[in-house]
Curated annotation (Swiss-Prot):
Organism whose genome encodes this protein: Arabidopsis thaliana (Mouse-ear cress)
Compositionally biased region (Acidic residues): 178-193, 669-688
Record's protein name: Protein FORGETTER 1
Alphabetical UniProt keywords: Developmental protein, Metal-binding, Nucleus, Stress response, Transcription, Transcription regulation, Zinc, Zinc-finger
UniProt subcellular location: Nucleus
One CC-aspect GO term: nucleus
PROSITE patterns: ZF_PHD_1, ZF_PHD_2
Gene (name only): FGT1
Cited function: Required for normal embryo development. Necessary to acquire heat stress (HS) memory, by modulating nucleosome occupancy and regulating heat-induced gene expression. Associates globally with the nucleosome-poor regions flanking the transcription units of expressed genes. Binds to the promoter regions, primarily to the proximal promoter just upstream of the transcriptional start sites (TSS) and somewhat more weakly to the region downstream of the transcription termination site (TTS), of actively expressed genes (e.g. HSA32, HSP18.2 and HSP22.0) in a heat-dependent fashion.
Family of this protein: Belongs to the SBNO family.
Disruption phenotype: Abnormal embryo development leading to reduced cotyledons. Reduced maintenance of heat-induced (37 degrees Celsius) gene expression leading to reduced growth and survival in heat conditions (44 degrees Celsius). Abnormal nucleosome dynamics at loci with altered maintenance of heat-induced expression. The double mutant brm-1 fgt1-1 exhibits retarted seedling development resulting in reduced development and delayed leaf initiation, as well as delayed flowering time.
Composition skew (Pro residues), residue ranges: 1-14, 75-89, 162-177
UniProt zinc finger (PHD-type) residues: 691-741
Short sequence motif Nuclear localization signal: positions: 643-650
Signal peptide: none
Amino acid sequence: MTQSPVQPPPPLPAQPHSAAGGVIRGDVQVRCAGCRVILRVKTGVVEFSCPTCQLPQMLPPELLSRARPQFPQSPQQPPQPIQTLPPPIQQQLKPLNLPRPPVPAHGIDPTKMQLPCANCQAILNVPHGLTRFSCPQCHVELAVDVSKLNRSLTASQSHSNPPTPAAPTVPPPPPPEEVNEEAIEVEREEDEGGTAGETFMDYRPPKLSIGPPHPDPIVETSSLSAVQPPEPTYDLKIKEELERSKALSCLQIETLVYACQRHLQHLADGTRAGFFVGDGAGVGKGRTIAGLIWENWKHGRRKALWISIGSDLKYDARRDLDDVGATCVGVNPLNKLPYSKLDSKNVGIKEGVVFLTYNSLIASSEKGRSRLQQLVQWCGPEFDGLLIFDECHKAKNLVPEAGSQPTRIGQAVVDIQDKIPQARVIYCSATGASEPRNMGYMVRLGLWGAGTSFSDFNKFLGALDKGGTGALELVAMDMKARGMYVCRTLSYKGAEFEIVEARLEAGMEAMYNKSAEFWAELRIELLSASAFLPNEKPNSSQLWRLYWSSHQRFFRHLCMSAKVPVTVRLAKKALSTNKCVVIGLQSTGEARTEEAVNKYGLELDDFVSGPRELLLKFVEENYPLPEQPEPLSEDDSVKELQRKRHSASPGVSIRGRVRKMAKWKPDSDNESDLESEADSADDSNDSDDEFQICQICSGEDERKKLLHCSECDKLFHPDCVVPPVIDLPSEAWICFSCKEKTEEYIQARRLYIAELQKRYEAALERKSKIIEIIRSLNLPNNPLDDIVDQLGGPEKVAEMTGRRGMLVRASNGKGVTYQARNTKDITMEMVNMHEKQLFMDGKKLVAIISEAGSAGVSLQADRRAVNQKRRVHLTLELPWSADRAIQQFGRTHRSNQTSAPEYRLLFTNLGGERRFASIVAKRLETLGALTQGDRRAGPSGPSLSAYNYDSNFGKKSLMVMYRGIMEQEKLPVLPPGCSIDEPETVKEFLTKARAALVAVGIVRDSVLANGKDVGRFSGRIIDSDMHDVGRFLNRLLGLPPDIQNRLFELFTSILDVLVHNARIEGSFDSGIVDMKANSVELLSTPKTVHVDQMSGASTMLFTFTLDRGVTWESASSMLEGKRRDGLGSANDGFFESKREWLGRRHFILAFESAASGLFKIVRPAVGESIREMSLSELKTKYRKLSSLEKARTGWEDEYEVSSKQCMHGPKCKLGEYCTVGRRIQEVNVVGGLILPIWGTIEKALSKQARHSHKRIRVIRIETTTDNQRIVGLSIPNAAVETVLQDLAWVQEIDD
């Protein structure tokens, strides 16, 4: 909106009169449209710039009459636009600290529209394009009808006269309509989109019927099950053999067919296409690989490379090959072979499987020969055999996050694929890539590169990041549709999950508090000790890195130890009910134990305390000590002095130095001998005239009699020195001045060294005291040794870990002894396999597994094993990453088992410990999304996503919390344990929270101010810490449990608020959502909109008709059913809205849900609402109907009207495209192959008017008549034409 500016007239001559409150009568007050400060504007000033924020603006219409002067304006002076006000007028505008008027007027912001509020009539500055907002004055929700506004503006412009220099007037726009609250609520729910449905479906190969059924129930995520793989065309050579032996199940044979079929294809760059086996742990990937090797062997491809994570797994490889009948195929472990040519006479491997680990892939000999070169040479450039990456997540960090380097293994995996381009690549892993960036090494899938939508991996990654979790889910579906991916998982049916909270016992809590206190004091001690060091800075960062990593490990140990009593109790309970126990942990504490054994010997009084040894090691090696000085002997003193002398003023000539320093007694008292050392030093290059030359010295005959000082190297006349020298000395002579200085220097040096020694000894004493305190602290023993001991010792407990030795209690019960884990009969390499066998044979009923010792180990209740007791799997320590969590869960849950395990996930009631669960939950979320097509997948049991704090919302919550604690912003929630009626409780909490954050090094440079701000706290949190949830949760561990839990609760409360708000705004990414309706019908035959050239897979556009309504009869029977079952409450029934909208009221059915006090809402047009409503909100917005007849009429009327129009009424600006509250609607879904057309759809959606329509949304929809399920991208009705046009263009290019 533009208006011609007005030249302000000269100020009125009349004297202003003061008004009440100090406001000058005739002036007007206006609130700045930018910074909202109240300004006083002189009479006649219509346009002005705010002196505070410099925003140019105008007076609003209601103040124009008061601002306009009462005399005519001179027509001769043309108006000039005002950029900034002239100084006199600038001075007339002063911010006022006055009480706000009841309805303060706002300045007009020329960049926005000015519209009156429908309720209080205040003129509002409304940004262009904003259609819904609340009035800041009276808080009524308002909506703008854009079409009416445009008509109004057009009309006002067509009737306007040529511009005159008169004061500007604002054309009156139509008042905004009051918002239909019910329409907004329904719209929000539609934007959020449906509910998260069931995650898994039972699995059977859809297009193959060869082979026996799998021995255990297998499931697939419902997203993936909605996608059909391509038609199988490959004919297996070993088909008849497999049908006879029944060695492979139907789903393992399906993998063989699709993998071999995929290996017949080539990517656009000429390399052979690869296949990804993403089956979950325990489905039988090993036997599937053996089947592939046997099939290729039959085709004459007799060389294969099998890369896995541990050399122990070669025994499993041998077993699997024997099971499928490939007994003649040799398995050659590479780690036992020399670096020479594998097919040479010495080594003699002409064919068979070379089995190696990922670490071998990057190994090289002393002579520089690498295993990678050796393998490539053995295969040859034309190699077209199998290259198997088993457990391929080991290569995951090829494309690392910012600031880190790609791993050598990741690089080697890509290199070997480049060097043998025709190899038949199999990627095989239950965890695949837990994040899309970890797919970087899967170059043979053809998802990026030549002939795809993404030129390189980074473009592919970028698209997925933008698409959110739904995009990850689509990648898995896409790969299945193109025949390059299978992903089935063992059903967790029968497996029981429970999260067990191990609350800190009283003794443990006291120990924890004492430890937190000690670490805080140690930090202060280290800070003050570092301050005495002269070169403190370089060592400082290293010291603090070690401090915080030790801090984290220490409290992690403590958390584990806190769970030992519960673990032992649960284990004994399981054993007493005829079950057996598997305990999973990550760290064994071996390093601490070995250090203690090296220090104290093989026999100890008790088990080693890991936390104590960790603290001792940190303090002993890192306490900042000043350098110990070396004492000076007499000889050293002289040498030191000479060194000092010779190093001084190297630029001065000896002759000059002699003359300057050989001072003698002057002849008269008129000459002053008070020359400062500084002066003499500065004059070294001046002329020699200023020196007094001794007449005797200058004589030729006397030159031979000069004395030479051995210290200062100067020459003196014997008679000129004080006192004079009569007999010339035969040995070294020192002048009086040097003799005096030498003694003085040595004395000072000795004092200095004594002071340094004193300081060093004081620091040493402090260090010794700290070590004494550490030794006196009551700290727990190593959890692993403790559990083994409490459950009966090594005779009863099978240990599968990576450690070499362990502490065992002596037979008399006194003291413990360190002994090797293996005996004479068993090598260290075989000890874990031996222990596993003892467990599977039932000779030991408790197994303890660590990540290092259990990779690939099967501990399920196997039908072939002696020990078929039900497994109780206790996770004492959740792994750092979900990759490892899945591997750990899969040890006890595998195919061919008599019973599924019971899982017990142990957490302490410490807020900070959830850090470890947070990482696992984050990984599980994206892991399920990518490798199993559905982000709620994880293992189909525990909901660990409740603990996912390390998300974007988590980072934002952390920042909000920090700012609130530092009192930079107001906290959006009341801190835990505080009362709104007692503000001092909040103040007290904030003080404690700041002190806690100082103690753990998050708040830096903290000081308490003096002077007028006495007691005021100052400190800062650096930007990188503001969003670092990991650091917050790690450091939180080091606080006493009380403040730790209060801080954590505050953080999660803020997170809940932010997530709730995001849901309301429709910006929360909830992955795949189900579209629910009473009737879902496919409207017409799906259109094929794109076909992939290589696989023949197509992209289809499906159009569905949904009827979401609930008839009066259905609603009545719902209510009747509740009452009949005795589940109803007095407040259940039919309600009508208190407010009318377009002359109509809305009707709902409300009944109390299981969550007491909250009501489920059913609407005639859209059925049951996702959001439940509180009783108070229900009574505020609706009134209960006593007349059923009135309820019926209103319900049926709304049911009928909503079939043809949306809730906004017949004049809705989106017209037929609007679906808000429309009972019958069309839904368009693009299904099938999505990845190749991703960019096209993204571009088309970006042009949509409604914000929620711009977002890529993945939905799942199922027809009610024939249960046809489609998963794909939702295309808003308004965008269908654009998408189809763009897709036709894409298809032409592809053709």
